[in-house]
């Protein structure tokens, strides 16, 4: 029987299944951070249980840490408690931890692939909704709750119902200036923020195949933003080249054997998907969100939609509420919207490719006077090291940006990088919900190049018309 890639991955990891019961999956890799793991370890202690397979779990610090200092003792309140608890729990259980004293530390979804912890064919979980990022490698990766974190620590398994399969095909080549972020925002704009609900999505087509691994991670990262359980890209030579010689990747004959297996990880030609979505790559323009969910997005060359022209009453009401919060009028030209802050970072867009794209725009330019702050936050210590080796940090600083240490930073209002009330931000992150970047902050999701251009020109501009250096 023909199978989709998702079905192959799921079936390969079922350790127990009975009629009328939810299947139990084996979990190959468990990634943890400081926010969703403390209660899980407390649960283990209360129950008198131990971590079942120590070598399958890896931790890092990212969500609540400061990107300005690397000293745990200078953290305050809940952030300090969370970070110290993670360190204590990892030490007590023999779990490998990339803490703030190591250059390998970083955002969990940047660190995992860098270290070769993310491999094709794996099941990967983390107490974080953007775990779908790792699906870019042909791994079944999804976010779990804290009680499930405890369950995986104790058993290395997880109850998981089968999802439906969706294929999203992006046909042809994108035009110059169009990035992975634009592709995935265009997908979400077409499907809406709930279009993938109940599905695991496989991204395919020439435009997806042409992406680097960094780009594929950006696409899979945002699968959750249109309701999908996970996102997948079948592994290929691009995948293998990225993973070769990574610290935790197989070596020697084990590598050869692994690649032989990984090449089988693809949907069968006659596999049947429950849903199919098709986009033409040539039609995708640089994307900017105008509302308060990632599905409220349009091309930079368009105007803010008019709710009065929306036939569906629910869509209309949602748009009216979003525009009231975001402070925009219908029919406003997207190129006439000024910004107060710019954030380049997050698990969506903080890899070296993203920083290079931003630097190409910012080189030789200065931050616009109306832009109060530009934060550039690398996704890991290794990304930071590489960027500094290439001199990107100097480009950012000379342009008027702040060059920070790795962490989740302004993606979410959980640390000391936040928007002021009613400030408008061009952000490379993944969510533009109300208050996501700080109380009453207004977030517009864009690509790194678009964010950098907004910083330099003080408003959203069409990156296709900006000279790159």
Curated annotation (Swiss-Prot):
**Catalytic reaction(s) noted:** (2R,3S)-3-isopropylmalate = (2S)-2-isopropylmalate
| Pathway assignment | Amino-acid biosynthesis; L-leucine biosynthesis; L-leucine from 3-methyl-2-oxobutanoate: step 2/4
Record keyword Ribonucleoprotein present: no
What does the note accompanying the cofactor annotation read? Binds 1 [4Fe-4S] cluster per subunit.
Q: Name the positions where [4Fe-4S] cluster binds.
A: 347, 408, 411
Judging by the UniProt lineage, the source's domain of life is Bacteria
Please give the biological process terms from Gene Ontology that the record holds.
L-leucine biosynthetic process
Pfam families in the cross-refs: Aconitase (PF00330)
What keywords are assigned to this protein? 4Fe-4S, Amino-acid biosynthesis, Branched-chain amino acid biosynthesis, Iron, Iron-sulfur, Leucine biosynthesis, Lyase, Metal-binding
Top-level EC class as recorded in UniProt? lyase
Q: Which GO terms describe its molecular function?
A: 3-isopropylmalate dehydratase activity; 4 iron, 4 sulfur cluster binding; metal ion binding
| Entry's EC annotation | 4.2.1.33
Which cofactors? Answer: [4Fe-4S] cluster
UniProt record similarity statement? Belongs to the aconitase/IPM isomerase family. LeuC type 1 subfamily.
**Protein's job:** Catalyzes the isomerization between 2-isopropylmalate and 3-isopropylmalate, via the formation of 2-isopropylmaleate.
- Oligomeric and partner information: Heterodimer of LeuC and LeuD.
Record protein name field: 3-isopropylmalate dehydratase large subunit
Instruction: Name the source organism.
Output: Actinobacillus pleuropneumoniae serotype 5b (strain L20)
């Amino acid at each position: 029987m023909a199978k989709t890639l998702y079905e192959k991955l799921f079936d390969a990891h079922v350790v127990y299944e009975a009629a009328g019961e939810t299947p139990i999956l084996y979990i190959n890799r468990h990634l943890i951070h400081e926010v969703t793991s403390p209660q899980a370890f407390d649960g283990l202690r209360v129950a008198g249980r131990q971590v079942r397979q120590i070598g399958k779990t890896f931790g890092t610090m990212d969500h609540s840490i400061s990107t300005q200092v690397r000293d745990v003792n200078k953290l305050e309140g809940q952030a300090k408690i969370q970070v110290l608890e993670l360190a204590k729990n990892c030490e007590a259980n023999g779990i490998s931890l990339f803490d703030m004293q190591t250059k390998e530390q970083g955002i969990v979804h940047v660190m995992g692939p860098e270290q070769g912890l993310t491999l094709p064919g794996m099941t990967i979980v983390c107490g974080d909704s953007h775990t779908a990022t790792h699906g870019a490698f042909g791994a079944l990766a999804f976010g779990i709750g804290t009680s499930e974190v405890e369950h995986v620590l104790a058993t290395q398994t997880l109850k998981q119902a089968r999802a439906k399969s969706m294929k999203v095909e992006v046909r042809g080549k994108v035009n110059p200036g169009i990035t992975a972020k634009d592709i995935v925002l265009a997908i979400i704009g077409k499907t809406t923020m709930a279009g993938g609900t109940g599905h695991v999505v496989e991204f395919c087509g020439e435009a997806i195949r042409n992406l680097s691994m960094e780009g594929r991670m950006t696409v899979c990262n945002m699968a959750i933003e249109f309701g999908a359980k996970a996102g997948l890209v079948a592994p290929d030579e691009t995948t293998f080249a990225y993973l070769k010689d990574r610290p935790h990747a197989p070596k020697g004959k084990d590598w050869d054997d692994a690649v032989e297996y990984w090449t089988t990880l693809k949907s069968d030609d006659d596999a049947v998907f429950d849903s199919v979505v098709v986009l033409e790559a040539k039609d995708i323009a640089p994307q900017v969100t105008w509302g308060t969910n990632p599905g409220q997005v349009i091309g930079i060359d368009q105007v803010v939609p008019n709710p009065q022209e929306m036939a569906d009453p629910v869509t209309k009401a949602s748009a009216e509420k979003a525009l009231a919060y975001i402070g925009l009028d219908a029919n406003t030209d997207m190129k006439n919207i000024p910004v107060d802050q710019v954030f380049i970072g997050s698990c969506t867009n903080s890899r070296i490719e993203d920083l290079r794209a931003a630097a190409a725009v910012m080189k030789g330019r200065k931050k616009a006077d109306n832009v109060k702050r530009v934060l550039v936050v690398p996704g890991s210590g290794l990304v930071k090291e590489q960027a500094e080796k290439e001199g990107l940090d100097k480009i950012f600083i000379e342009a008027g940006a702040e060059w920070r240490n790795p962490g989740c930073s302004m993606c979410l209002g959980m640390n000391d990088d936040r928007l002021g009330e009613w400030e408008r931000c061009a952000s490379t992150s993944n969510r533009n919900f109300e208050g996501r970047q700080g109380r009453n902050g207004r977030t517009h999701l864009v690509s790194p190049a678009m964010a950098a251009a907004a910083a330099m020109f003080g408003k959203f501009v069409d990156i296709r018309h900006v000279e790159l250096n």
